[in-house]
Amino acid sequence: MPNLKSIRDRISTVKNTKKITEAMRLVAAAKVRRAQEQVTATRPFADRLAQVLYGLQARLKFEEVELPLLQERALRKVCLLVVTGDRGLCGAYNSSVIKRAEERSNELKAKGIDYTFVLVGRKAIQYFQRRDQPIEATYGGLEQIPTAQEASEIADELLSLYLSEEVDHVELIYTRFISLVNSRPVVQTLLPLDPDALVVAEEDEVFRLTTRGGQFQVERERMERGTPQEMPSDMIFEQNPIQILDALLPLYLNNQLLRALQESAASELAARMTAMNNASDNASELIGTLTLSYNKARQAAITQELLEVVGGAEALN
């Protein structure tokens, strides 16, 4: 028969663990809200920038535009930018991105194409360093809610590698936020930039974390973008439109990278919230099972004591 004290100790331990997981769930939920606010705050600038780039591209569509960030080169070496988190306790968030990065590197290796990594997040850094993979740069200890400065530092490194022709292609591997319980690691080409893809993008969505019936839920709102308008043919530029486009493309790259970092952060926080919610549910179930075992053990102990008393009384008679 299990010892009553050991069962009580286990129940107490599980209850304390549940308090921790519940607190972590609430913290992650609050940070998911902040991540959403960041995405929403940067959207007007991103939309307007895309509109301007579209107008410039349409204005220059009949001209020979030779800009380094737009030129396709023979594919000899690819830079893989991998974005993970710094901490665990977030389900399969980190392992899914790392697995996708390994799959992509194996695909390149099978084609005889060289590759190198730029790693964001301690989990990716630790994983690929242990496996002696080629690494150009690492970025660990970033803010949980990514900032424009952090995105700019990473973008500068990528631009340096690409413009110096150390790499011919830059691909981003990050986690796209789909829902509170669902996210997907994706591969996206960052460099060279595709002018047509600047505005031919998938429809945007905003996610909002809400509470309903005491449970967290995600509401999604589809954001309709306005139809891009070409600039008037008689518009006069103080600078050459090609020079303006050349100056705006790095800014667009920074914005794309910031958005990817924000989505990755939101995915990590949502995964951690879900993991802690599941842990809390499992703790509640375990507490119920242990309480039942405790009551059975106590009942058995009482029954045993009664039998001993009755047996002693009968022996005296």
Curated annotation (Swiss-Prot):
UniProt GO molecular function: ATP binding; proton-transporting ATP synthase activity, rotational mechanism
Keyword Transport attributed: yes
Membrane topology: Peripheral membrane protein
Domain of life of the native organism: Bacteria
Keyword Membrane part of the UniProt annotation: yes
Localization, UniProt: Cellular thylakoid membrane
Key words, A-Z: ATP synthesis, CF(1), Hydrogen ion transport, Ion transport, Membrane, Thylakoid, Transport
A GO cellular-component term linked to this record: proton-transporting ATP synthase complex
Oligomeric form and interacting partners: F-type ATPases have 2 components, CF(1) - the catalytic core - and CF(0) - the membrane proton channel. CF(1) has five subunits: alpha(3), beta(3), gamma(1), delta(1), epsilon(1). CF(0) has three main subunits: a, b and c.
Physiological role: Produces ATP from ADP in the presence of a proton gradient across the membrane. The gamma chain is believed to be important in regulating ATPase activity and the flow of protons through the CF(0) complex.
Family under the similarity heading: Belongs to the ATPase gamma chain family.
Protein name (record): ATP synthase gamma chain
Annotated gene: atpG
